[in-house]
A protein has these predicted regions:
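Membrane-proximal intrinsically disordered regions of secretory-pathway and membrane-system proteins
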Residues: 1-166
């Protein structure tokens, strides 16, 4: 198995709360805006920071904190937790292990090389949207949804978590 520099996992809660389904609808719109800001602006920010800080950039905890909050919001929107900032869920685990020597050219190259990941995440996001609708209806009825659907959404967020620090 390949060792990824970013790992993500979260356990399925015993029950979900019904009001959070409606809050997630609003959260999905906010997430859409935040998502595009992360995809477009984070690589630019990383390139600027790498050009000015070099090796110190890898030790920067601020970016790791932003990524942790972003993945926490993904976890909430994708029906993985009832915590709005999913990183506050006790079963939430997101770790980033920086490595290599950062360069400006490398940051720009990763931006271009990440385009296939963005396309795959977009396709998986479409599937996750259908699962979100089914899962939301199931939560409204029984305060729970199928473990298989949870696992698919967790896999989508795991892919996002592996790409985001890239």
């Amino acid at each position: 198995m390949i060792a990824y520099p970013a790992t993500f996992d979260i356990a399925k809660p015993a029950r979900f709360t019904r009001p959070n389904v409606f809050i997630r609808i609003i959260g999905a719109f906010i997430f859409g805006i935040v998502n595009w800001l992360v995809v477009v602006l984070l690589p630019i920010y990383a390139a600027i920071q790498i050009s000015s800080q070099k090796e110190k950039y890898l030790q920067n905890e601020t970016v790791k904190g932003w990524l942790r909050s972003y993945i926490g919001l993904c976890s909430y929107v994708y029906l993985l937790t009832d915590e709005f900032d999913g990183s506050k869920d006790p079963t939430f685990r997101f770790d980033v292990t920086p490595g290599g020597t950062p360069t400006l050219g490398g940051a720009l190259l990763r931006y271009i090389m990440g385009i296939p990941h963005i396309l795959i995440i977009g396709a998986l996001g479409s599937v996750a949207s259908i699962i979100w609708i089914i899962g939301s209806i199931m939560i409204l009825i029984s305060e729970d949804y199928a473990a298989g659907l949870f696992d698919i959404n967790r896999g989508v967020v795991r892919w996002i978590a592996r790409y985001a620090p890239y």
